[in-house]
Amino acid sequence: MRRFVLSLAVASIVFVPVLHAQHAPSAQKTTQTCPPSTTIQELTKALDDAVSGPGNKDRTCLRNLLLPDARLTPIRKTPDGSFAPHALTVDDWIKAVAQRGETAFYERQIKVTAENYGHFAHLWSTYEIRDTPDGPATVTGINSVQAVNDGTRWRVLSILWEPDTTAGPIPERYKP
């Protein structure tokens, strides 16, 4: 009897994980492929693609483009009428956007100015937000992006942004 129980225990340890792995849903089916970000232009395009779409879409690519401790910080109007940064972690931003469900938005950088030194860069970009990929812009604003190159790719350390609805019209020098 002891031999049978021991054999059953060994079989459970060896075969159950294998069977479970064979029947588990494939992570590849739900994981979004993230394009390379070896240049600032690739990073900008990948960021637009990663934040755009339905609120509840897979954000694996966004997580890969941002450093683990990255901050996403919109400038918001406070109840007393002043303006203040509202710093979010990557998870905070994903949870907030997921509340939109299937409702989508599409962000597009229309002008990007990048300053690089060594392994870091600052991107000053004018963005437009649309309700559909080719629809009219409903919001415009400015992003300030801090990016770091690890020797193989660019990743985002922080994004600070403010829409024109709080800051006023976009100055001509930031328009395409």
Model feature map: region roles:
Residues 1-4:
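Positively charged n-region of N-terminal signal peptides that target proteins for export
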Residues 22, 140-169:
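Short beta-strand edge/turn micro-motifs at domain boundaries
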Residues 47, 62, 70, 123, ...:
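Hydrophobic pocket/interface hotspot
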Residues 66, 76, 125-127, 160-161:
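A mature extracytoplasmic/lumenal domain signature
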Residues 23, 71-72, 84-134:
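Surface-exposed, charged secondary-structure patches
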Residues 7-17:
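Bacterial N-terminal signal peptides
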